[in-house]
Amino acid sequence: MSSDAEMAVFGEAAPYLRKSEKERIEAQNRPFDAKTSVFVAEPKESFVKGTIQSKDAGKVTVKTEAGATLTVKEDQIFPMNPPKYDKIEDMAMMTHLHEPAVLYNLKERYAAWMIYTYSGLFCVTVNPYKWLPVYNPEVVAAYRGKKRQEAPPHIFSISDNAYQFMLTDRENQSILITGESGAGKTVNTKRVIQYFATIAVTGDKKKEEATSGKMQGTLEDQIISANPLLEAFGNAKTVRNDNSSRFGKFIRIHFGTTGKLASADIETYLLEKSRVTFQLKAERSYHIFYQITSNKKPELIEMLLITTNPYDYPFVSQGEISVASIDDQEELMATDSAIDILGFTNDEKVSIYKLTGAVMHYGNMKFKQKQREEQAEPDGTEVADKAAYLQGLNSADLLKALCYPRVKVGNEYVTKGQTVEQVTNAVGALAKAMYEKMFLWMVTRINQQLDTKQPRQYFIGVLDIAGFEIFDFNSLEQLCINFTNEKLQQFFNHHMFVLEQEEYKKEGIEWTFIDFGMDLAACIELIEKPMGIFSILEEECMFPKATDTSFKNKLYEQHLGKSANFQKPKVVKGKAEAHFSLIHYAGTVDYNITGWLDKNKDPLNETVVGLYQKSSVKTLAYLFSGAQTAEAEASSGGAAKKGAKKKGSSFQTVSALFRENLNKLMTNLRSTHPHFVRCIIPNETKTPGAMEHELVLHQLRCNGVLEGIRICRKGFPSRILYADFKQRYKVLNASAIPEGQYIDSKKASEKLLGSIDIDHTQYKFGHTKVFFKAGLLGLLEEMRDDKLAQLITRTQAMCRGFLARVEYQKMVERRESIFCIQYNIRAFMNVKHWPWMKLFFKIKPLLKSAETEKEMATMKEEFQKTKDDLAKSEAKRKELEEKMVSLLKEKNDLQLQVQAEAEGLADAEERCDQLIKTKIQLEAKIKEVTERAEDEEEINAELTAKKRKLEDECSELKKDIDDLELTLAKVEKEKHATENKVKNLTEEMAGLDETIAKLTKEKKALQEAHQQTLDDLQAEEDKVNTLTKAKIKLEQQVDDLEGSLEQEKKLRMDLERAKRKLEGDLKLAQESIMDIENEKQQLDERLKKKEFEMSNLQSKIEDEQAIGIQLQKKIKELQARIEELEEEIEAERASRAKAEKQRSDLSRELEEISERLEEAGGATSAQIEMNKKREAEFQKMRRDLEEATLQHEATAATLRKKHADSVAELGEQIDNLQRVKQKLEKEKSEMKMEIDDLASNVETVSKAKGNLEKMCRTLEDQVSELKSKEEEQQRLINDLTTQRGRLQTESGEFSRQLDEKEALVSQLSRGKQAFTQQIEELKRQLEEEVKAKNALAHALQSSRHDCDLLREQYEEEQESKAELQRALSKANSEVAQWRTKYETDAIQRTEELEEAKKKLAQRLQAAEEHVEAVNAKCASLEKTKQRLQNEVEDLMLDVERTNAACAALDKKQRNFDKILAEWKQKYEETHAELEASQKEARSLGTELFKMKNAYEESLDQLETLKRENKNLQQEISDLTEQIAEGGKRIHELEKIKKQVEQEKCELQAALEEAEASLEHEEGKILRIQLELNQVKSEIDRKIAEKDEEIDQLKRNHIRVVESMQSTLDAEIRSRNDAIRIKKKMEGDLNEMEIQLNHSNRMAAEALRNYRNTQGILKDTQLHLDDALRGQEDLKEQLAMVERRANLLQAEIEELRATLEQTERSRKIAEQELLDASERVQLLHTQNTSLINTKKKLETDISQIQGEMEDIVQEARNAEEKAKKAITDAAMMAEELKKEQDTSAHLERMKKNMEQTVKDLQLRLDEAEQLALKGGKKQIQKLEARVRELEGEVESEQKRNAEAVKGLRKHERRVKELTYQTEEDRKNILRLQDLVDKLQAKVKSYKRQAEEAEEQSNTNLSKFRKIQHELEEAEERADIAESQVNKLRVKSREVHTKIISEE
């Protein structure tokens, strides 16, 4: 934003362009609440500002600035922008972009008189309705060369940008100033022209004035002056605008190579000439009328014979006559000076004023009706005299021409009477035509004057066209104007929204297409397309009796109810009648069609036009010189034909001319780079500063302002080609682009932009250009300017440094020279007083004196010579100087001449170019005329020559007839031969019919078998569905009843039995397919037999074709002769027509003579006699002409007779043949060969032969088609059967399809190989896992001390498991790829088959239509037969190879089965080991139960513990409720997921440690049993020692109690922390359980869908494989492999589960072993005090034992559940289920351990109390117990660490399983789509089979029909023979006649 100092250059315009700094600071500091400040929708003012008071249930209460309170919906409020965006210059920069924000920004700027605002890529201007100082010269200078962002918004900124774009981009520009009428378009257009005329002056005005003598001003002045002149004659006051342009103009300002003005031209569109004679009440006519009557120039009033009162002239005073905002007197002076500046001559200027005055007088001409007649006559001649005087006419002639016009009726001219209304309309039409032509002539003269002939390179076009108009009365002019605005708006929309986004797509930029809903095509097409409004209007204008009513009816019939934009208007009282309504983009407009036909035809009184052409006012004569009247046309004499043509071409309706000009305009605009200025009308009352919200909003919506801002903000409005960008902006970082090596412009641009410090999201790279967001290019330009400034500064510094160094070097050299001189002078000064040196000085000159004397003498001589030479040279020099002066003068003169000649040469070159163009056009016309003349001469010569040749040709025809007789004899022989062939063919067809019947039976049988297989497959699918349902039920039973492992095995066996049953059904289906293949082989053998028979037929057909070709050649020769004779007849007809034209010319001349006689005066008797004589002469000439025509007809008749004698006198036979020819021509090209029957009977014979050949071919085609249809039906079962019944061309195509199917076989085999590889990989992985299991089991049995080693092996096993999962997912993805590829290939094959079917149908039709195609097809059949045989052999080889491959695969399958059996055996062994370990676990459980009975005595002491346990259970129930509530906070827990996972790991580790401690307690119980006996024996001995140790124990106990108290406090704190963590973790675990359950369900469903689709896929694959030989076994084996792989995978998962269980038990056992060893040592160190605490400990142990048994039982149940889930669910679901079970088990263990910790703490408390009582021994026992607990804590910590590791592994596994689930889901969907497509194909094949049956029936009917036609052809051949005999007789008679005549 510029400062106030920078804005000072704009002078007094600064406050009208940009806010001051003070206002900006105040706006930024103004208080603003972004949450409550809003715009709210309000009915009266559309939107008002307000603040939100409250919100309630979708309703918002807003208090407006006016104090009103509104309650609206939330979608009716819009957020307000911060204050810093108030009066923003570019609305695209606003934070909140919506309608109220744009409206209020415009309103606030308009209130501050800032009328220009940017809106993205274009400028919006609001009409101020007052003068503002924003167009002053200092403003023009301030905007010159400024970038858009550097200066405030202004029309000058748009203009300067267009100018700069033209110079930099070297592309034509255009500025489209659009908007509604009264929005300020004309003013902005003038300002644009003013700007260009100011900044781009030519600079050489003197030269310009010298080169163009007529010019009164410079080019700049002329361009500016064109506007006042055009406005005076083309602008008028309307309801909405005081200075409305009533015509459109497109001003092109041309610039030279340097950017200076070169020339200009103006194109105008659609002047509203109806305004000349009619205005509405609130409007007035064109300004010129009122300027003239303003009396500013009284000489005009006198010259034009008018008054100063406009009301004296009805044409210009029907509305208002004055406008407050226009000074007509000043405008008249401006118009007058503009005429002078634009170079109009004085005569032309006077003519303009005179014709304008004549138009005014025309409105005063009055006519009245004659008495008792309808004829009009003048009502006074005074006005007519004035008008005629001003037009240079005779008033009497003018009145006569108006009242009695001459009209052409036929070939005569008649004087027509006119009514008063007709004369008045004619006067108005003449006035409008004269004014329009004068306006267009003025534009042409302006263009001539503005054309300076200077070289022009580019132009900037400024479009100012009438805005959208909605008046009370809308006529044809309004429709044209509104249609133009529709086109311009569509251009704007297309350029701004569609082209912009299409270029993004074309350039490859990521862009989502935005439909802004701005397509106006419907309304445009309604107006301009065929059968649109303009089309119907022009059509009605062509009909003489058309009326407005008929036009309206046609419009209603064509569009009412059919087009949404065309409506019937409602009748409103007080408004003008409307006939139809159109919905335009700016609103609905009612149109009145009254007088549209006349307006469109624009009829003129031709008699008056003829007077105009003879006017003494040269301008008027010139205006109408191009009009070709009927009389002038008639008087053109010999050029009548040319004149008629010119009149026909000149008749063009107004609408057609308008559309032509509009299309040219749109073409010009599309070739330029457009800049849009959208003018807005603020109010209807023309009040300055007032703005009507709804009116402005309507214009914003219609003009696309909001959409333009959006596309500017979202899109990339600036773009540069890569090469241009690299060249222009390389300076920003030259190092980014390496020098000396080639680099692509795109890569260079990418590197350059990447190295610059800018926002890299603000640009995108396209294919050819780099695209920038709005504003970024300006930033780059600023950076470039700064960089250039730096570079130039650096260059200047380097240059200055170089110059300084050069100067310094010179100084150094001068210094050295000075030192040398000083040295020499000092040396001289030292020796000059030395005596010897003085002697040297004296003697040395004397030594050289003699020599010097000689030299002096020679020098004197040379001096004398040089003196003489100097005198001579001086004389010569003076002469040369004189010559030089003269030559310089001549040179200057020559330069001036050369300059003038160069300019003349440029003009001459342009003229030469124009002359060359005209010469080329004239040469083309001359060439056409000469060619026509030559053609006429050739035709005449040919006629004479052909007349002479007719007799010769008659004799030749006789010879031909003799030849035909000979050929006829041959043809008869051939006919007998063909009859025999036809009989043979009919016999063969009978055989073929039998084979067809057999084939149909076989087809039905195959269809039944196919249907049976489909039914079987459906039954299998039903079984699979029932099985899946049963499986689901079983899964539910597993979840509900927790069945045992034996039940799962039973279910598995049931499933395997079902699978075996399905496999057996599949084998049965495969056996049926083998039977079908055997039948196919039999059909192949039959096909070979048929092919052999067809080859024999082909050889016969080829022989007949050779004969047929010879006959056709002869027929064509005869036909050519007949055509020549017909051409001669046509030539005679042409000569006759020429004679008739000459007769019409003579009649025209006679009529003209009679008319001239009538015009010369009255009809005297002498003249009547002369007329009679001339009529007699005319009759005589007519008779002569008729005789001549009769002679021509006689000659033509003689020619026809001769032709009939030679050929056509063949009589009835030729007539019959001609009728046959006509009939055959109507049947298009079906029987094309029968046309030759016109020549001779030979053609009939050849036609019969052709019919026979056609029958043969059609029969063959029918057979082939039946076979092809049969093959299509059988393709579902076996695609190879498609070769049956086809001819060799069709069989070739289907053999290619067979190749494709074989390719599919190879693909499937490759897929099978891929599957086998996958299976082998699975085997290897299974072997590795089994080895790992064996190693682990061996390690478990051998030693429990290798825990760490086994743990590492377990981790490796998990990694291998993950690898297996990845490999399996990869294999599944490959399978999916193969399936998709197979699917696409299958679809392509079916599409190709359907295309082949269509091609076959086309070929059948072509064979029926073109019998000649038999020759080529017969030749191709032999080739295709050989190729087919080769392909069949290749196919047999391929089949053998596939069979061998199948055998190899069988061997591999058997080996794989053996391997699987071995794995099963190993699995059973491991399972047995697992069961043994479980039995051991049960035995341990029983021992624990026994121990529990032994410790029942301590139950009394545990009652207190039980109460506390109940309290804890209550707390646990509360915690479970909290866990349920925690499931609702899933999204919150996800945020702290990382922390929770860490805590979960710690907690799970603690749970595992607790579990280990429980297991440790079990081992402890066993040890205690052993120790009890020893303890009993020692108790008696230690009782005596008890009393002695009590005192010591008390002291020790006090210390222990204190330490225990501290430890208990720490334990309480840790317990509280653990409880808190537990609550969090329980919520997390519950959430994870829900997620796991959900994923389990999803996985189960996906698995069920997967299995269903797998079953369907197998069935469909089996159906598809039926079409491929030998593929059934492959499919079956593939299915078996997949099932076995699934079983193996399930078994692997079971083994993994059991392995994990054994691993867990192994770990527990190891931990127990360690604990046991520690406890043994501790027990040995314990004292006898354990006897008293033994019972308490035994009760604790018994309680723990019971809880442990429950835990073990729960673990067993969980294991059984996990096994069931593993067997029934898929691989992924099993893993997830296992994780869920383990997490539940850990949760239960955690709870139990918490309980045990509490119990232990209670026991500790009790132990303390007992210790106080029991003494020293009890204290020792408690201390030992404390140590035990500390050891347990340490072991728990170790287990915690191990659990963390395990938990992380499980988490990784869960992620892998979720990924695998997603892949399986995608595969299932893909398979489902494939199944749907294959089912659709099966249905289409069924439908095709039915169609084939129908086609076979139709072919049989066609065959019978052809047989019938063959019989008819034989009858016609017999008839032809009899006709030939008749022709022979007639030819002999003709011959005898000719001989007798000669």
UniProtKB/Swiss-Prot annotation:
One of its GO terms (cellular component) is A band. Residues 788-817 form the IQ domain. Expressed in type 2a myofibers in the tibialis anterior and soleus muscles (at protein level). The rodlike tail sequence is highly repetitive, showing cycles of a 28-residue repeat pattern composed of 4 heptapeptides, characteristic for alpha-helical coiled coils. It is found in: Cytoplasm, Myofibril. Its main location: cytoplasm. Myosins are actin-based motor molecules with ATPase activity essential for muscle contraction. The modification Phosphotyrosine is found at Y389, Y1467, Y1495. Residues 33-82 form the Myosin N-terminal SH3-like domain. This is Myosin-2. Residues 1130-1175 are annotated as: Disordered. Keywords: Actin-binding, ATP-binding, Coiled coil, Cytoplasm, Methylation, Motor protein, Muscle protein, Myosin, Nucleotide-binding, Phosphoprotein, Thick filament. SMART domains: IQ (SM00015), MYSc (SM00242). The modification Phosphothreonine is found at T64, T69, T419, T1244, T1258, T1289, T1470, T1504, T1520, T1733, T1739. Residues 86-785 form the Myosin motor domain. GO terms for molecular function: actin filament binding; ATP binding; cytoskeletal motor activity. Disulfide bonds: none annotated. The modification Phosphoserine is found at residues 625, 1095, 1099, 1165, 1240, 1246, 1264, 1291, 1295, 1306, 1309, 1477, 1498, 1517, 1557, 1577, 1603, 1606, 1717, 1729, 1742. InterPro entries: IQ_motif_EF-hand-BS (IPR000048), Kinesin_motor_dom_sf (IPR036961), Myosin_head_motor_dom-like (IPR001609), Myosin_N (IPR004009), Myosin_S1_N (IPR008989), Myosin_tail (IPR002928), P-loop_NTPase (IPR027417), XRCC4-like_C (IPR014751). SUPFAM superfamilies: Myosin rod fragments (SSF90257), P-loop containing nucleoside triphosphate hydrolases (SSF52540), Tropomyosin (SSF57997). Muscle myosin is a hexameric protein that consists of 2 heavy chain subunits (MHC), 2 alkali light chain subunits (MLC) and 2 regulatory light chain subunits (MLC-2). Interacts with GCSAM. Residues 1131-1159 have a biased composition (Basic and acidic residues). The modification Pros-methylhistidine is found at H760. The keyword Mitochondrion does not apply. Residues 849-1930 form a coiled coil. Residues 662-684 are annotated as: Actin-binding.
